[in-house]
Amino acid sequence: MNIDRFKHQHVEILNGIHTLRQLSHQGIADHAVDIAHELQALAQVITQHLAIEDRILYPSLESSGNDRLARMSASYQNDMKGIANAFIRFARQWGNAALLRRSPEDVRTAANTVLKNVHARMMRENREFYPAIEAL
């Protein structure tokens, strides 16, 4: 199974997280417009990535005839629901520059949790899930 598109989206997601971290370190209030823009762009990539996984990747793996990959796929899909929901709530809540300026420390606290979880998930997929798929 060719998963190059998924891997490319992981690079985009990880780069987006890195950019948000850099902007946050430079000052949330001072870079609120850029942070809101980057967060919206990241949300778009993540939303698209999740939709493609749900419509194509997970169903393909679950019907692949490979029990190990089918179980792994179901587990990853289930695990991602909580991470995805938290990220979507975060992006909706903090995708506005005025709100970012008003509550920079609240943004930082939420971002440290949500973005850390998304980052960890991408790294885990890159390390465990995608190599297993490519070995098919």
Q: Where do the PLM segments sit?
A:
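Small-residue-biased structural context
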Residues: 1-136
